[in-house]
């Protein structure tokens, strides 16, 4: 966690063009910072979090949202990208159905990103998740022997439209 490795900006250079579409510099926090603690080695969390095969069983709500369009990409420069198109069809989760039904159609994002979920990550455990209406940033880290934590926060552009408030 300390050392002379490349900066996060350099590692995420490949992601810069896509991430910049989301106007992160203009976003504000939309929730309080969160932390979860686990009784396991932090490398276990990072390994599982970076392997897409766990998504259908480990993240049933995300899988319900993006379904079979979910894909993982391993890219150069130590980053990976997962993505899926947010399905406009019927969802098992009522929360997902409500999200899809209320997410405004008008967006500052290009059409290619208006209904896409994107997950950029790099070792050790730093993640930027992009939704059409918000982003989430989190990281995983050790806090002791066989003890780990994950901490993050969500951000969004100011948007007073009732549909956007409902979607969020």
Regions found by a protein language model. Give the residues of each.
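C-terminal catalytic domain of Rieske-type non-heme iron oxygenases
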Residues: 1-168
